[in-house]
Each structure stands twice: as structure tokens, then as C-alpha cells.
């Protein structure tokens, strides 16, 4: 519904997506698995690249019990652009505010070292958001608080809006404000 909030839950890193490209970028960089990963507070390349995927089930169940969760999507292959539209009616779009969440350093490193754009990072990888939930605006802060109680980080990353037309008449269902 127009006006609903989109809450994003942090990923732990790559999860299970984009490893072919990440491996190519890693090879280009010359970093070795035991090297310190740039900007990762002493974690090694191996630890950053193979960080275990977060399991969201307990936090999600908590919200489903008591809140009006209108949609949810696991941000897997296809990133924001392929996964978020799966939970939206055709007449609306997700407007995502880039920078409204804390992105793990691996994504900035992949962008810079791999000469990628931010849209590519959000298409190929999860960009630091592993799961999204759509809720009424008056429930998003409570949702974030509950998610944090499970030692997960969460943010209000965007809103649902009436779907707009692009310059060529095409419509996109995920619009990221960079």
C-alpha cells in the first residue's frame, strides 16, 4: 500500500550470492585468504568472503505474530531489483534510500576494486540488506526494535509509492535514490 515502510535487516556479507564475480575481483586485487580485509577491523579475506549467512526466521516469526507484515523478501540472487518486486502489487514501487543502512565494507571494496556501480552492487549482491519487510508506517519502529532484540540490525530503508513511468515509458518497481 502506498505509504508503507520498507524495513531492511542487515546481511552478514555476501550470503550465497555473487561469488563468481567476487572471486574474479579478489583475484584481480591480489589479496590472499589470510590477508587482512580492507576496512574490516582485522578480519581476514577468508572470514569476510565466507561469513555465514544470517538466519532470520526467529525475528521474522516474532513480527508475523503481532504486526501487520504486508510483504517480505529474502534478498538473494538478483538483489534488490529482482526480489523486492515479488512482494509488491503491480501499481506500486519501492523507493529505497541508499545510505539509510550501514553497508558492510565488502560491498564498497567490491565496487571500487571491481569497477562496479552501486546499481550493479544492488543487483548482483545484497548490498548489506539480507531481508526486507513491508509494514504500515506506524509499525516500522516497533519492527526495528523487535528485530534488534534478536541481535540483528535493521533500518527503515524506503517506502512504497505509486508506480511512476521512466523516460522511455518503462516502469521500474524498485527505485533507488542514490
State what each model feature region is:
Residues 1-36:
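Phosphate/diphosphate-binding glycine-rich loops and adjacent basic-rich segments that engage nucleotide
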Residues 33-50, 54-178:
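Glycine-/charge-enriched secondary-structure boundary and capping motifs
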